[in-house]
Regions:
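Cleavable N-terminal signal peptides of Sec/SRP-targeted secreted and luminal proteins
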Residues: 3-19
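CBM-like carbohydrate-recognition segments
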Residues: 20-115, 119-121, 127-128, 180, ...
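Alpha-helical positions within canonical tetratricopeptide repeat
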Residues: 33, 84, 88, 138-141, ...
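Inward-facing hydrophobic residues that define packing positions of alpha-helical scaffold repeats
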Residues: 38, 73, 93, 124, ...
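Short coil/turn linking the two alpha-helices of tandem helical-hairpin repeats
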Residues: 77, 128-135, 196-200, 261-265, ...
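Extended ligand-binding groove/face enriched in aromatic
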Residues: 90-91, 95-192
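Juxtamembrane/interface segments of multi-pass membrane proteins
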Residues: 139, 173-175, 204, 221-244, ...
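Active-site cradle of extracellular carbohydrate-active enzymes
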Residues: 183-199, 203-260, 273, 277-280
């Protein structure tokens, strides 16, 4: 064995002495460790700080990631029963709705894209399905918010370029407006799938099928290579596919397909989910440990956004395990191994259990800590509770996955109490016609921000083109 390998192993051994340790078969152990990681996640929250913004996390974390982080905290309560942060979560989700209750706050117009809005809508959907504390009568309800996001997103479907699909950006002045990315369309697909399951409204099923079909026809979902889901296409050259693969894109589609299978019993959706999972196994796991392969090679290059993708992926493959018995054991095996590996990195920071990015080695690094690392460790750990009756009492199983009354995630017919409206958001102003006070310098700043994000996506995936 090479000397460098011996040194590496020694460092890993030293790290593991101080790392969080979990009995993955003990729900109480999982819950106790999840509480420590959740506390670390909330250390990045900006809303309690002097001059901070309710619902937002400290710089450099963008608005979209805040929406995804609140979903992680919602899951934390649901799976562990720990309601410590529930009031904060509720306040955050309602503070950021925007004046039209559609998660289009004007102060985010220089950065907000379709995917950003989509993740807040998905979090609102999760709140409805989990019977999270309902807002007051004079406030928008969780289902209403999810429907408003869906309606405003679907209204932007663009048939003039590439025969359909959503653009990445909502606003014309943001760089990336000429790019149709998979995550925006994946959010629309995923949200439509869950709205259909919750409400039974066929409009949502139609849109889920429409979004899937477009992604498949455009080459972003390619069944010829086990659905290695690609990043997006340029509207000026629709055959120019950006090849990078990300866990969260796969998660959106496997999770949405699982919800649709549960709602329809249509084997088409089960087959699609299984095929995506086969691709995920090929790309995103090494020795059963999860890896963000497009930016975790011999050198880690993940940007701030990409460092939380494993959180979103863990959440959605958890749903796939819940609804798809054929791949359940395989998914849970990888969630178990990944959770144990993730906690090996949770050994640093002033609290002694700050988590890091490299689950393959278990090594902690001060260079790779932040909101995304905490989210990812939290989600991969707490999704090991998805079948635990003590921590998730609404879950029951049968040969077809989870069906019937009293089952989580809930529907309107199985105990979900959140109310909405099929027309939610439809009366909102067209964001492209809004009388916004956008100065030239703001447009330039927005362009720089979005360009930086795009460069990060392209730069971190250098290996795909090598």
């Amino acid at each position: 064995m090479k000397f460098s390998r011996l040194i590496s192993n020694a460092l890993i051994a030293l790290t593991s002495v101080c790392a969080l340790t979990v009995d993955i078969d003990d729900p109480d152990s999982i819950a106790q460790n999840a509480a420590l990681i959740a506390q670390g996640l909330m250390n990045y929250y900006d809303g309690h700080r002097y001059g901070g913004v309710v619902g937002m996390f400290v710089f450099p974390y963008y608005w979209w990631e805040a929406g995804a982080a609140w979903n992680s905290m919602l899951d934390f309560w649901y799976y562990t029963g720990n309601d410590t942060y529930n009031d904060v979560v509720k306040e955050a989700l309602l503070y950021q709705v925007g004046k039209n209750n559609d998660y289009l706050p004007v102060n985010q117009s220089t950065t907000e894209g379709n995917d950003d809005q989509g993740f807040w809508g998905i979090t609102a959907m999760a709140a409805a399905e989990k019977n999270f504390s309902n807002p007051g009568k004079d406030e928008p309800q969780w289902l209403y918010l999810a429907q408003a996001v869906f309606n405003t997103m679907s209204a932007r479907w663009d048939t003039d370029h590439c025969n359909g699909g959503l653009r990445w950006q909502i606003y014309t002045w943001n760089n990336g407006y000429d790019y149709k990315n998979t995550v925006s369309n994946g959010c629309l697909f995923h949200l439509a799938a869950r709205l259909y399951r919750y409400t039974g409204n066929d409009t949502y099923l139609h849109w889920a099928e429409k979004a899937w079909d477009w992604c498949e026809q455009s080459g972003l979902l390619n069944k010829e290579d086990n659905y290695h889901i690609r990043d997006g296409v340029d509207v000026n050259n629709c055959s120019n596919i950006t090849p990078y693969v990300w866990t969260y894109n796969a998660g959106l589609f496997i999770g949405g397909s699982a919800f649709l299978y549960n709602a329809t019993s249509d084997d088409t959706w089960a087959t699609r989910a299984k095929n995506i999972w086969t691709g995920c196994e090929e790309l995103f796991f090494q020795d059963d440990k999860m890896v963000e392969i497009s930016c975790q090679q011999s050198r880690i290059t993940c940007n701030n956004d990409q460092r939380c993708f494993k959180a979103i992926f863990s959440r959605f493959i958890g749903y796939a395990a819940l609804f798809l018995p054929d791949i359940r054991d395989d998914i849970m095996k990888k969630l178990r191994a990944s959770a144990i590996a993730a906690l090996q990195t949770c050994s640093g920071g002033s609290d002694g259990h700050t988590c890091s990015i490299d689950w393959l080695t278990g090594a902690y690094s001060n260079d790779w800590i932040g909101l995304g690392e905490q989210m990812s460790a939290l989600e991969v750990l707490q999704n090991n509770l998805i079948f635990n009756p003590k921590m998730a009492p609404n879950v029951t199983t049968n040969e077809n996955g989870t069906t019937g009354g009293g089952i989580g995630p809930l529907t309107h017919d199985t105990g979900g109490t959140s109310e909405g409206s099929p027309d939610a958001g439809s009366s909102s102003a067209n964001p492209l016609l809004m009388n916004l006070d956008i100065k030239g310098s703001d447009k330039a700043g927005a362009g720089v921000l979005t360009a930086v994000l795009l460069i990060g996506v392209l730069g971190s995936g250098w290996w795909m083109l090598a």
